[in-house]
């Protein structure tokens, strides 16, 4: 088995905290300057079903949602699943092997390059209900100081090194990041669905026959259309130019785009494909994303100990029925948490104001300090429970309270169920140059990986 760590890039700074690393790679938050939001067409690379196989079997969820067991299942299926490109380490291979495979699949005809530059319309639906619809293109990379593409989470050097090594070896963007922006219009007038001109172009395009369509094992139907008309490209550019985009998902991949761009600029390279990165851009006025909560499981914290200590600073209400407890949590307007793991569930509300003030980092804004995840991290986990912040002590479960509670009961630990953050709070915090605490947001639906790739070779 090759030593896959040998080809990790060495030109990223080391020894920095996530805050320091993120500030350097995104760019320090300052008043808005520079060019506006750009999404440019590109010649997409797509699977050819007649050669590669059924599209449901060659695509996958985003790489960071794939654990080792899921990756092995995808690999066991053989064939051309994009996991062989996007997660080469799961197969014990180095990054260069993924790049070689990409070029081999292009030569064999399993992948094809579209003849003309295009923007792509992507849609995810369930049982005929559209959950997600937006534009896939090459988003212009901007320093955070430009106020155009806004991160809301810090990033870690390790995942950026991994993605940068892969992106360098493949010379390609293998999956899109997920961006949202407010296109304008409130959609409250009769016949007005909301959104800007770009959203209207998206809907008009989606009324036609899709380029590809399939139902995947996630229960969603995925569709893709292609826009090649330069006049429509120009309308999209004009509509989004003055907008801000929030990174809903893909902070480490966006940081990787920025690292690759910085590498080329440091080498004296002029403008090129490294000045943009593959992205799905969604008008949230027209198609609001689902913003789910990320629940915590603390395997080493007994439920009775957790509740006893929490009573010192929270009002605790006990429930026997899970559905009633989750519903009660959803109705609480302020910081609130639901603890599970034993036979009962325990709703924590009304945190002690003095304890809250003492536990909160003073350098953050009042809006940041009011986020449920900030209260959880600094008051409950850090101060009351004194649990270290690491992956062994704190596990996460996306969206599903029942799964988190069941996990806690299996481990003898404590589950902490949260309400989702409000999208407007996330955007406001990001707009001030702050980061929400780690594992605060779960935007969705996330775009399927493998629908369209962006190869950076000029000749492709």
Residue ranges of each PLM-predicted region?
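Surface-exposed, charge/polar-rich loops and edge strands
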Residues: 2-460
